[in-house]
Design a protein with these regions (language model features):
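Structured catalytic-domain cores with a bias toward divalent-metal coordination
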Residues: 1-502
Length: 502
């Protein structure tokens, strides 16, 4: 049963292979079935031909069950087969491969239960690409090296990828990095993918799994894509089998690295530093389309080429913060606590009231989009002020220590300005709205007393009035300036229910 399998997985090296998170991209389902058929036909061996113990291999046949049931042959306009497939969106029309940190779906909670029960050393997410036309059937996305621990960076990029490239070549396939175009065509170069925690592989990387997204080419025939996916699977199984002890050791070292992190970097930006890579593509041109009358991009498969193109693969963090001893999350934030719990985050729940001096986050500004993204109006360009204050802690509030295996997940979700933090995903929007105001005709009679009791405010007010004509001519602006700095102003406005202790 599954419990025994999970126990066995925790005791050894484990691979988790995910399929059909986008059910219109079903190559991995068939590849896994073929692998299992072959394994059964061979007598269900538990060792490789060289006598090495096989890892525990767990398959998710179809992550997006709702999308799988929405069948058609038309939702993938640019894809070459199969005859029928599912739909990208879930029953609630979520792209579930954007849901791994915000966890809007039950799928994400179920996945977290599976993932943390297995604690996979290797995670594979099978997909089919969109984009340019080129000769490769099989491409891959590896986790962004700059966000990884030094141990997993070295293991992935210096050992695993070269091994996979050579292994699938023996099976007749070229393995190439995912063709994420820098411009309109490959001639302008390709760039490394930023696997944020919203994505399956980015999420898995937070827990130090070797993480890959397999991307077969949409225009290649379906049977060919399935065989290429199978070749990658066999390659990663072979690598994991041969290098099991090193993988286990490097992951343990990576967890220790994360527990002892002093500085957390985030908001990674792609640089203009370019390497070069040999690329097998097709010549392209821009003839006029007979219907639209406009220039169209066309690839000519009768004119294949192999040439060097730019490869942009270096990211640098725009921001970094010191790692606190622990975070405090208000006990009223049950949605946050549920997600921390689901991801095996360790925390202490307070049973009595107390007062502590904590590092407080106050939102100064942010941008909200005009259109929703995956069920949210995701915040960006967040500016946060920080200060030390005495905070009344209540029973039910939780203390989340940074020194634990889930450290990267904790920082990614609780640091307000991190790319996929819970603040950006609107978990704390209620704190961004003011709840109380004042009436001018009443409050104007109180300002003399407020200013008399606060000489610094009096000085700031007079300076603003002397230097800002708009302010000087607006009763509301003047009264609000004083009100927002007075004891009457609500303390919860723009102040997050997350604190830090250093």
């Amino acid at each position: 049963d599954s419990t025994r399998t999970f126990a066995k997985a925790l005791a050894g090296t484990t691979i988790l292979i995910n399929n059909a998170i986008h059910p219109g991209e079903p190559d991995g389902i068939n590849a896994c079935l073929i692998w299992l058929d072959q394994w059964i036909a061979q007598g269900k061996p538990l060792e490789s031909k060289n006598g090495d113990k096989l890892p525990v291999i767990a398959f998710i046949p179809a992550y997006n069950v709702g999308g799988m049931m929405n069948r058609s042959s038309t939702s993938r306009a640019n894809q070459n087969g199969p005859e029928e497939y599912g739909f990208r969106g879930s029953t609630r029309n979520f792209d579930l491969n954007r849901d791994f940190i915000k966890m809007d779906s039950k799928n994400a909670f179920t996945f977290a239960k599976i993932f943390h029960s297995l604690d996979p050393d290797v995670f594979i997410d099978n997909h089919v690409s969109n984009g340019a036309d080129y000769q490769y059937t099989l491409t891959y996305i590896a986790s962004m090296k700059e966000r990884m621990s030094p141990q997993m960076n070295e293991l992935t990029y210096e050992k695993c990828i070269p091994y996979l490239t050579a292994n699938v070549k023996q099976h007749g396939w070229d393995l190439f990095p995912y063709v994420e175009l820098k411009g309109e065509t490959p001639a302008q170069g390709i760039h490394a993918f930023n696997d944020l925690p919203r994505y399956a592989m980015g999420y898995a990387s937070l827990f130090h799994s070797i993480s890959f997204t397999v991307e077969t080419h949409m225009l290649k025939p379906f049977p060919q894509r399935v065989q290429a996916t199978l070749a990658f699977m066999e390659g990663i199984i072979s690598f994991t089998t041969v290098n099991a002890l090193e993988i286990e050791a490097k992951r343990s070292a990576a967890k220790l690295w994360a527990r002892n992190l002093h500085q957390y970097a985030f908001n990674y930006q792609l640089t203009e530093k370019a390497d070069s890579i040999s690329f097998k593509g097709y010549e392209h041109s821009f003839p006029l389309h007979p219907i639209t009358g406009l220039k169209e991009l066309t690839y000519d498969r009768t004119k294949p080429y192999e040439r060097m193109i730019p490869w942009f693969k270096t990211y640098i963090p725009k921001d970094s913060v010191s790692v606190p001893e622990y975070y405090v999350v208000g006990g009223q934030e049950q949605e946050v606590i549920d997600r921390l719990t689901a991801n095996h985050v360790l925390f202490e729940t307070l049973t009595s009231a107390s007062i502590d001096t904590l590092h407080v986050f106050s939102v100064k500004s942010y941008k909200s989009p005009a259109q929703p993204y995956e069920g949210h109006f995701k915040l960006s360009q967040i500016e946060v002020g920080e200060s030390e204050r005495a905070i009344d802690l209540k029973p039910g509030d939780i203390l989340v220590p940074s020194q634990q295996d889930a450290a990267l997940f904790i920082h990614a979700s609780l640091q307000p300005r991190a790319e996929d933090s819970y603040l950006t995903w609107n978990f704390f929007d209620s704190y961004l709205q003011q709840k109380e105001y004042f009436s001018n005709y009443v409050f104007k009679d109180q300002i003399a007393d407020i200013l008399a009791k606060n000489p610094q405010l009096q000085e700031e007010y007079q300076l603003r009035k002397a230097t800002d004509e708009k302010f000087r001519n607006s009763e509301w602006d003047q009264l609000y300036f004083i009100y927002s700095r007075s004891p009457y102003f609500e303390q919860t406005f723009m102040r997050l229910p997350i604190y830090q202790k250093f």
